[in-house]
Amino acid sequence: MAVSIRLSRGGAKRRPFYRIVIANSRSPRDGSFIEKIGSYNPQLPKDNENRVIVDLDRARHWLSVGAQPTDRVARFLDAAGLLERKARNNPNKAVPGEKAKERAEERAQKAADAAEAAKAAAEAPAAEEQAPAEEAASNSEEA
């Protein structure tokens, strides 16, 4: 029989309350369990001492006989210093997707076009200013 340390939901609709239980992994989430070793109330603030309550002696016993904690319970046990969670490595998580890359390229192209247009607009008045000065110089030579 595979035994797991997991959460069993209780409480009213939209007001969850969880018991941390030892249960057969094949039994339903809120079904029968072997032993209750704690509770978790997500409604309480994160710094509240009653948010997560775990009987560490019983948890240590069940871990020693091979019970497997779920991810959330493993997080609680790690915070209590009873279990060392493995660090997960997902280097591709932060890599942008194809559409995001396309949008970034389009933005870069628009920025380059805008910079080029601004540069051309800045050069055009400068060229026009030089032209009247040349005309004035040629007009003064004629006079």
UniProtKB/Swiss-Prot annotation:
SUPFAM superfamilies: Ribosomal protein S16. The keyword Glycosyltransferase does not apply. It comes from the Bacteria. One of its GO terms (molecular function) is structural constituent of ribosome. Keywords: Ribonucleoprotein, Ribosomal protein. GO terms for cellular component: cytoplasm; small ribosomal subunit. Gene3D superfamilies: 3.30.1320.10. Residues 96-110 have a biased composition (Basic and acidic residues). The keyword Ribosomal protein applies. InterPro entries: Ribosomal_bS16 (IPR000307), Ribosomal_bS16_CS (IPR020592), Ribosomal_bS16_dom_sf (IPR023803). This is Small ribosomal subunit protein bS16.
